[in-house]
Amino acid sequence: MSLSIRITDVHGREILDSRGNPTVEVEVTAQTEPTGRKTVGRESVPSGASTGRFEAIELRDGEERFFGLGVSRVVDHINKRIRQELVGMNVLDQVKIDRKLVELDGTDNKGNLGANALLGVSLACARCASNALDMPLYRYLGGMNAKKWPMPMMNVINGGAHAKNNLDFQEFMIVPVGAASFPDALRMGAEIYHYLRLILHEEGRLTAVGDEGGFAPEFSNAKEVFACLQRAVEKAGYQMGSDIAFAMDAAASELYNSEDGMYHFPGESRANQSVEQNLARPDTEGNGEVIRSAQEMISLYEELALEYPLISIEDGLDEDDWDGWQELTNRLNEKMMLVGDDLFVTNVKRIRCGIDLHVANSVLIKVNQIGTLTEAMDAIELAQKNGYKAVISHRSGETEDAFIADLAVAVNAGWIKTGAPCRGERTAKYNQLLRLSEGLDA
């Protein structure tokens, strides 16, 4: 006889994320039959700053309160319509629950009830089920095959939409590839992070942090950042390449201008002008603006990879530039991870298109891009079955929730992005991975 743990209540509320903006928290209560034992699962929903055009829709109120960012309408959907449909369902039937949520919304982009409504409920159901079974979440999601700790890609220098500086590329990460265990990896990253703070201070640069806990100082370009990171790595006593590698998120869609088909670098342009340099692409006005074509973007990445141990580039080109992505993949596929975030948006249809076109070799997984746990896990399965790496990722607007730490272990992702070893909403994930690593293979 199959176990029956029936949902008795679904309750949503408005809470604050790490940027002080409203987001959704959901509690699902279920009762085990015939014992009558009640269990609660609670989860919250993150929010991104630089979002892909093809992401599922995050609903906001658009009213005066919270500058239009309130989610009271989403909470209302959860507490009325969604609750009415889910009460009585078996909380163990995750696929059926998620199908019901998608059916209730009735749109391709979750624009009716909101991806933030669906995701909060979906994740809370999974948490409630694992609690009801007295089973760790990663084990409930991944079964006995969940046994691999993920390598952290730690965002220590922030730019782009995550910081107010001249850095056009969004994230610069250190990756402790030489670590023998997750505790070692986290220690190495934290040590380098603190040495980086000292170096920035000595150089007279700001050590204020951005949304993801990384520092947000002024640099003119990516090469300056990597040179500074190299100094921090060496000062911490580690070897470039064998101990520590680099990764970056270009977030190129944020730089792309659809009118001229070029990538515009306003921060680098300002930095060049401030030191009376003109390193720009020649243009008719000769105004010193830094503009790059897709080919020049790829050449820049090749230069960086020759000079530094760069093992991963995320969103190296625009989310619609499939031809450019094919060229990027042809030239760099054997040298590094080419990660699609805005390109794929955790969407099975777009991932399948990328596979068919031989575009990229890795997929960034953000559960709120698609709206339900089942759809996210389908995306991971499709990627891994076709030889693509899966990188589990946070968002820039996070909460103290650590669901993605368990998810990364559950699917043996091998890689996780959850910011710098700083700020409570980031360290919550790292600390959960420390706990999980005690029962995992090294």
Language model segments and positions:
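Metal- or metallocofactor-binding catalytic centers and their adjacent structured scaffolds
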Residues: 46-131, 135, 186, 214
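Mobile "lid/hinge" segments at catalytic clefts and subdomain interfaces of large enzymes
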Residues: 147-210
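Catalytic core of soluble alpha/beta enzymes
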Residues: 223-442
